[in-house]
């Protein structure tokens, strides 16, 4: 019976409390720059990057930060509406991943507020896999844009922002080295997942991802076809795949069924949440995920 690993993943939010959008309209919209600059991030891993780049000059609020909460049940609150309304800078994923924040931004418009849509930085569009923080290019692009945005708002500390950006880029090198190492060892390895939370990283690692139609159906909240379910089960039972990744923060009966089949067949199972764990920065979170995948695949490596 394989051990179960844990790492982080992605967020989908489908329930919006429409009445709260109105609260954003009546919230204060005065965005005169003060110290520290107020940054709101829809996802906590983006908020962490804002803290690393902004340093002592920013105050960061991350809206989605509880790995024990089912993100599908996330509900807006008056405090969230106020935070977004009062922010100098708002960061969110985009491409239909966090549409609730777009509603709040429309409801509390401000010519002075800067908005960073992370998907736009790397040319992703609606319909693309939204778990873009696993694309190695994404985080570097966000850090660079944050530094530029903060310099424009606070040119007196230009050197500080640039120094923090340089340190951040340097801190990503161990992750890049780990990706290169795992790609050399495991490129071409057939793997699968109940949904495509790790898709961009699998691509960076050069792995062969199976059951993508099944994953796409789950991502779009539709029932996988009978043939897709049968193919998935067969891949697990016949050891056609070497690893199963599932979302431990928002699961359903069919995903739980695939986990049971994988464990019974001796396929390593790696579970993950949809927010970064408490007490970890982006770098330690990503390295932990890569380590979990490495441990799982090493158990059956030749």
Describe the function of each predicted region.
Residues 10-11, 19-21, 105:
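Extended rod-forming repeat segments used as scaffolds/tethers
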Residues 1-14:
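N-terminal secretory signal peptides that target proteins for export/translocation
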Residues 10, 31-33:
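Intrinsically disordered, low-complexity serine/threonine-rich segments
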Residues 33-302:
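Extracytoplasmic metal-acquisition and chelation regions
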């Amino acid at each position: 019976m394989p051990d179960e690993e844990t790492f982080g993943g992605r967020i989908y939010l489908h329930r919006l409390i429409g009445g709260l959008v109105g609260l954003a309209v009546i919230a204060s919209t005065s965005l005169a720059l003060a110290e520290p600059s107020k940054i709101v991030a829809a996802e906590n891993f983006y908020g962490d990057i804002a803290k690393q780049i902004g340093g002592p000059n920013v105050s960061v609020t991350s809206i989605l930060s509880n790995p024990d909460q089912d993100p599908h049940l996330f509900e807006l609150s008056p405090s969230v509406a106020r935070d977004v309304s009062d922010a100098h800078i708002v960061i969110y994923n985009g491409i239909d991943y966090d549409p609730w924040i777009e509603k709040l931004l429309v409801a509390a418009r401000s010519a002075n507020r800067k908005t960073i849509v992370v998907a736009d930085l790397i040319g992703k569009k609606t319909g693309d896999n939204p778990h873009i923080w696993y694309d190695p290019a994404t985080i570097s692009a966000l850090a660079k844009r944050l530094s530029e945005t903060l310099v424009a708002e606070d040119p007196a500390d230009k050197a500080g922002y640039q120094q923090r950006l340089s340190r951040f880029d340097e801190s990503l090198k161990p992750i890049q080295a780990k990706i290169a190492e795992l790609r050399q060892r495991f490129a071409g390895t057939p793997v699968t997942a109940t949904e495509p939370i790790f898709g961009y990283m699998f691509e960076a690692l050069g792995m062969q991802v199976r059951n993508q139609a099944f994953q796409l159906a789950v991502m779009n909240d539709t029932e996988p076809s009978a043939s897709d379910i049968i193919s998935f089960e067969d891949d697990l039972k016949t050891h056609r795949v070497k690893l199963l990744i599932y979302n431990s923060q928002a699961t359903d009966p069919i995903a739980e069924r695939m986990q049971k089949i994988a464990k019974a067949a001796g396929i390593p199972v790696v579970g993950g949440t949809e927010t970064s764990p408490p007490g970890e920065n982006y770098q330690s979170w990503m390295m932990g995920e890569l380590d979990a995948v490495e441990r799982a695949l090493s158990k059956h490596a030749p």
